[in-house]
């Protein structure tokens, strides 16, 4: 397996990550990618198949970052993001997705998400996005950037009314 630098000092604690996805195989895949490809610089604190369990874990032992699937039964990724960001020690949230219905990016940002990670991104890209969001850098892959621009163009008259020139 390849090693990907997360640009952190070796003396620092690993970045802790929580994963929420209703597919247990995706949870396991993300755990393997994050822990094995980062050579121990990322540690998966929990991998839950529903948002309620993940929020419970995060409230007792807050991770640095949560990867939250967007489309889940029950509480979806948007609502779980909103609830995670309301915790006393809120984690960074990256939306984990393979599809992006219209307005998903805009709604996720409004809920407090700081970026998107595609389930099909290369392992080194996923690791880099996790590390970079911890440094305060929003993380939007090309697909989410295109969708956000498209969403903004659809809402342009509304958006322009917010700008006072």
Regions found by a protein language model. Give the residues of each.
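Short hydrophobic/Thr-rich beta-strand motif most characteristic of the beta2 strand and flanking loop
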Residues: 39-49, 57
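Acidic catalytic/metal-coordinating carboxylates
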Residues: 50-53, 76-79
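The feature encodes the CheY-like receiver
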Residues: 26-27, 73
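Active-site beta3 strand of CheY-like receiver
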Residues: 61-67
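Conserved small/polar residues in nucleotide/adenosyl-binding loops
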Residues: 163-165
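Active-site residues of response regulator receiver
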Residues: 21, 69, 73, 97
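Short, flexible helix-to-coil linker/hinge segments that flank and couple to helix-turn-helix
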Residues: 105-109, 120-160
């Amino acid at each position: 397996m390849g090693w990907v630098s997360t640009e952190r000092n070796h003396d620092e604690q690993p970045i802790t990550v929580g994963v929420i996805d209703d597919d247990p195989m995706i949870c396991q895949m993300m755990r393997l990618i994050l822990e094995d490809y980062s050579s121990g610089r990322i540690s998966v604190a929990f991998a839950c198949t529903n948002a309620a369990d993940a929020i419970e874990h995060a409230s007792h032992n807050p991770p640095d970052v949560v990867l939250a699937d967007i489309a889940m039964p029950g509480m979806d990724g948007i609502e779980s993001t909103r609830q995670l960001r309301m915790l006393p020690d809120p984690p960074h949230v990256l939306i984990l997705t393979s599809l992006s219905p219209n307005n998903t990016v805009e709604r996720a940002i409004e809920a407090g998400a700081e970026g998107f990670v595609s389930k099909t991104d290369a392992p080194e890209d996923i690791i880099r996005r996790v590390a970079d969001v911890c440094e305060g850098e929003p993380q939007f892959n090309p697909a989410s950037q295109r969708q956000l621009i498209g969403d903004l163009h659809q809402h342009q008259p509304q958006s322009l009314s917010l700008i006072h020139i």
